[in-house]
Amino acid sequence: MILGCIADDFTGATDLAALLVRAGVPVSLRIGLPERPGIGPSDGVEVVALKIRSVPAEQAVTQALAALDWLRAGGARHIYWKYCSTFDSTARGNIGPVAEALMGRLRARQTLYVPAF
């Protein structure tokens, strides 16, 4: 797969998947953490819809990293973290901790935060 996407909620995942489909990109949408290897398009995108928008950061990090590992095992060459752009889901927030954990696992030195879709 060209792109692996992790979304913090179902709505964001479906918005992203719909946008990609409208652009002609083959997309496979997964609800929750996948248990089996992906069978999506090798030239397309896998979107994993999690329900971590309003959970504690530790739980969000654990699930996001599991999704990342699944996407990478399926051959994702690029990763996109689709988070809620309103930043108001939890008192302390989990967007930053999840992004930092993903960066750590990917050994990325930089990332872009784009709070709009």
Task: Give the residues covered by each predicted segment.
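Non-transmembrane, aqueous-exposed alpha-helical and coiled segments at domain scale
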Residues: 1-117
